[in-house]
């Protein structure tokens, strides 16, 4: 897999191992359950997560037809369906487009419709009724918790550079030096985003 947007250095990728021939160059690959594309976008990851969550929605419909209580259906969605839409979210959350975020939200809305037996125009009202949360807010909280645990873990403290001058002129505490990103893609990637989240207390 080749990661490069440069036209000047866009050379053909060829790797050979002994006499086994040339390795195939792929545009996407699954790494620890996360679909990574050479374009550094998350279309394939979102599609895969929605597909897995949709399988759980089918089970919810089946359980509802058998008379399973609504509270148990909600619990099943939380433990089996929603987790599919949040898998490894610290890696990809900051790089989502609006359309990708909406596709994840729609999967939860379909699940809520399957649980209640009706489609509500008001997303917020149905979330409150079932005791669920917006996915984007949950992802933000998960990312911040992940960043805090990583920063406090002695094995990974080198990921975040500690700011020697924690106080700025505006009086805001800046615990970690933020990464200077020359491109919007890098700015929206995981490490710069997590650093900003750690500084936003």
Q: How would you label these PLM feature ranges?
A:
Residues 1-27:
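Short, conserved micro-motifs composed of acidic
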Residues 11-14, 43-46, 139, 199-201:
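Short conserved micro-motifs at the rims of enzyme active sites and ligand-binding pockets
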């Amino acid at each position: 897999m080749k990661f490069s947007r440069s036209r000047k250095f866009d050379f053909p990728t060829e790797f050979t191992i002994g006499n086994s021939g040339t390795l195939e160059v792929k545009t996407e690959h699954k790494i620890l359950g996360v679909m990574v594309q050479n374009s550094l976008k998350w279309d394939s990851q979102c599609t895969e997560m929605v597909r897995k969550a949709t399988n759980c929605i089918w089970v919810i419909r089946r359980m509802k037809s058998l008379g399973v209580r609504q509270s148990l259906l909600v619990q099943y969605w939380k433990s089996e369906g929603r987790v599919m839409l949040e898998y490894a979210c610290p890696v990809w959350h900051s790089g989502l487009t609006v359309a990708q975020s909406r596709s994840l939200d729609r999967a939860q809305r379909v699940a809520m419709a399957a649980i209640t037996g009706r489609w509500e125009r008001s997303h917020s009202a149905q979330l409150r009724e079932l005791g669920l949360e917006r996915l984007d807010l949950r992802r933000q909280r998960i990312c911040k918790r992940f960043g805090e645990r990583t920063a406090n873990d002695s094995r990974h403290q080198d990921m975040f550079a500690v700011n020697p001058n924690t106080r700025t002129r505006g009086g805001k505490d800046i615990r970690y030096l933020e990464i200077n990103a020359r491109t919007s893609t890098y700015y929206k990637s995981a490490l710069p985003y997590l650093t900003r989240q750690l500084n936003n207390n």
